């Protein structure tokens, strides 16, 4: 897709360019093809609610594919508000049975609203520090909560720290009580995005997600700006603000905060995605990758989305970027961004939802980015991971269902609207009339 240049220039100088490219994906080997469809993850038990009841209400707040050491297989976890109270619950999926609620350890509850803040999306990070796979969930309202396949432990600053099966002591003075973002770096769990302390980045003790005391090696790092997102890339943990980017490195067993740039930042928290050995994010000037050069510690930031700049500017100016969901399709070297617009009546139907699809493709002997538009996919959260050797791309919707992308040739039974429009073809002469014939 190239929405930034005029038709005559595209016709003469960029054969194969499209002026409209809706629901087409660029191929790694060149050219375009219509995207595949999506369907309910389970045709019978698609809605995240206990089978035969209405325990769930509202949108799916989060979805994850967890490598569960206890069951010995991957577990799909979805999160949704309770229908009968103001809390939300975690559900796990079982084939042929549907969704079942987890019972949280120590009678923990997860309020939807607390301290004038409301849960809108739940993010997660998985890790294994040597004692099995764990997954940590954050929502920006409640304490982070860690699941090890057996029990759930909330990480609170008022706790003494450490893991105990019978008591919830996880946490310590350096923990953040309402983080919105989470990731893992150098065998530490990192939390940030706490509304009350927006510049704070907290990390656990080494190889211990349950201990957040200074004596054990936990700590906090002030970013110097409101943190939008944190994301590890190679030997650095990048810290994104709206106007600046910094990185955390390790020196002499200490975390060091260094400047990357003070001229650009990230304007959509969930746009930060790692794909094909790079880190991509949405800035006011478009999609930017952080690409490491041959010199250690030297990073180059350059826009890869100039051909669709006008399309992106329209999205940035007119859409709520907090609704943006991003997901990577690794097998296709693709990243997909979904935007769910609203009006005075609330969330719009799927047919009104837009997005951007980007992929790497062979071009001119090298690999470059190509982009297109998405239309007709409404998301409230997204994730992708492997179940066995198969990549599974999931998204939750505002209707409370979990869907699987790359499934079928329709949008859950509806036709896929697709458009591929070329520039006007003048065959090298704009003023000469032509006669077109076909065989």
Which residues make up each language-model segment?
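Short loop/turn segments that connect beta-strands within beta-propeller blades
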Residues: 94-97, 148-150, 250-253, 293-294
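Asp-box/WD-like beta-propeller blade repeats and closely related beta-sheet repeat scaffolds
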Residues: 149-181
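Surface-exposed extracellular loop regions of Gram-negative outer-membrane beta-barrel proteins
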Residues: 88-90, 237-261
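Carboxylate/His-rich catalytic cores and anion/metal-binding grooves
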Residues: 177-209
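Structural signature of WD-repeat beta-propellers
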Residues: 80, 139-140, 193, 240-242, ...
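Hydrophobic or amphipathic alpha-helical targeting/insertion segments
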Residues: 121-161
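Beta-sheet repeat architectures centered on beta-propellers
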Residues: 1-135, 264-278, 285-439
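Short loop/turn positions that demarcate and connect the beta-strands within blades
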Residues: 57, 176, 222-225, 266-267
């Amino acid at each position: 897709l190239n929405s930034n240049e005029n038709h005559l220039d595209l016709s003469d100088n960029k054969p194969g360019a499209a002026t409209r490219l809706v629901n087409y994906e660029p191929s790694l080997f060149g050219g375009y093809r219509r995207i595949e469809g999506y369907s309910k993850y389970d045709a019978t038990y698609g809605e995240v609610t206990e089978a035969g009841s209405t325990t769930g209400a509202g949108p799916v707040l989060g979805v994850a594919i967890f490598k569960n050491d206890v069951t010995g297989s991957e577990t799909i976890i979805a999160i949704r508000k309770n229908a009968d109270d103001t809390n939300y619950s975690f559900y796990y999926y079982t084939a042929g049975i549907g969704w079942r609620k987890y019972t949280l350890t120590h009678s923990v509850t997860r309020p939807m609203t607390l301290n004038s803040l409301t849960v809108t999306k739940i993010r997660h990070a998985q890790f294994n520090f040597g004692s099995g796979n764990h997954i940590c969930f954050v929502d920006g309202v409640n304490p982070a909560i860690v699941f090890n396949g057996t029990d759930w432990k909330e990480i609170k600053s008022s706790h003494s720290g450490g893991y105990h099966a019978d008591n919830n002591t996880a946490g310590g003075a350096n923990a953040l009580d309402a983080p919105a973002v989470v990731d893992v770096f150098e065998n530490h769990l990192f939390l940030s995005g706490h509304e009350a302390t927006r510049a704070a980045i907290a990390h656990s003790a080494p190889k211990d997600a349950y201990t957040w005391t200074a004596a054990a090696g936990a700590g906090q790092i002030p970013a110097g700006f409101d943190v939008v997102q944190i994301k590890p890339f190679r030997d650095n943990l990048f810290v994104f603000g709206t106007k600046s980017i910094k990185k955390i490195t390790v020196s002499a067993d200490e975390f060091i905060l260094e400047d990357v740039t003070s001229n650009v930042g990230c304007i959509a928290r969930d746009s930060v995605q790692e794909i094909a050995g790079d880190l991509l994010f949405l800035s006011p000037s478009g999609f930017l990758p952080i690409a490491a050069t041959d010199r250690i510690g030297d990073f180059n930031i350059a826009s890869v989305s100039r051909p669709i700049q006008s399309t992106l500017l329209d999205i940035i100016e007119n859409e709520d970027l907090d609704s943006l969901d991003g997901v990577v399709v690794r097998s296709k070297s693709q990243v997909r961004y979904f935007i769910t617009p609203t009006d005075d009546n609330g969330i719009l139907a799927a047919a009104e939802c837009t997005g951007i699809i980007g992929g790497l493709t062979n071009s001119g002997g090298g690999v470059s980015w190509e982009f297109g538009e998405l239309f007709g996919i409404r998301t409230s959260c997204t994730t992708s991971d492997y179940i066995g050797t198969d990549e599974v791309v999931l998204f939750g919707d505002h209707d409370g269902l979990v869907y699987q992308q790359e499934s079928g040739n329709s949008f859950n039974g509806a036709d896929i609207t697709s458009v591929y429009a070329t520039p006007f073809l003048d065959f090298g002469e704009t003023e000469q009339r032509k006669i077109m014939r076909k065989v």
